């Protein structure tokens, strides 16, 4: 299915993998394919998911480039200085890691996208708001490490960048 309609060459509702890659790029296509469904029902490639993935990946890339230094002075921060928000985020990361690992083992890639992509991006925004834009570097490093490791099987080019 394409955009909730049955694919058909005669009606023009048809898109090849090459066309998807040319239109959305490899990473957004892979996210949309993983989100298309992993049950016995017909998979539904939704162009709005691919378009949203392009935007989300671009915003994430720009945020990483502008806000995350390549090296962090961990000596100036102690891991014991976690506040309530740091502990909440650390616990959420641990919970999400478990859910995503189970989803990968069961090959339920839609659930992987839900937790490893959508939920982690929302978690970052909530954390930054709660910390008034001044996150703990240990938590931030763990967040990025978790995000990139969990998404590497689906969007390896982005994660290795």
Where do the model's predicted regions map?
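Long, charged, mostly alpha-helical binding arms that flank functional sites
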Residues: 1-142, 150-157
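Short sequence/structural elements of tandem HEAT/ARM alpha-solenoid repeats
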Residues: 160-161
């Amino acid at each position: 299915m394409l955009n909730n309609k049955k694919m058909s060459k005669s009606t023009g509702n048809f898109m090849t993998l090459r066309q998807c890659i040319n239109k959305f790029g490899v990473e957004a296509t892979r996210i949309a394919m993983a989100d298309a469904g992993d049950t016995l029902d017909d998979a539904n490639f939704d162009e709005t998911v691919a378009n949203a993935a392009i935007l989300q990946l671009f915003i994430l890339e720009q945020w990483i480039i502008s806000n995350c230094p390549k090296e962090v002075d961990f000596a100036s921060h102690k891991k014991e200085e976690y506040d309530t928000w740091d502990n909440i985020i650390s616990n959420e990361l641990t919970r999400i890691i478990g859910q995503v690992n189970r989803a990968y083992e069961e090959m339920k890639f839609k659930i992987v996208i839900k937790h490893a992509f959508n939920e982690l991006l929302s978690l970052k925004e909530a954390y930054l708001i709660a910390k008034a834009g001044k996150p703990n570097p240990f938590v931030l490093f763990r967040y990025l490490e978790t995000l990139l490791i969990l998404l590497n099987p689906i969007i390896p080019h982005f994660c290795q960048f």
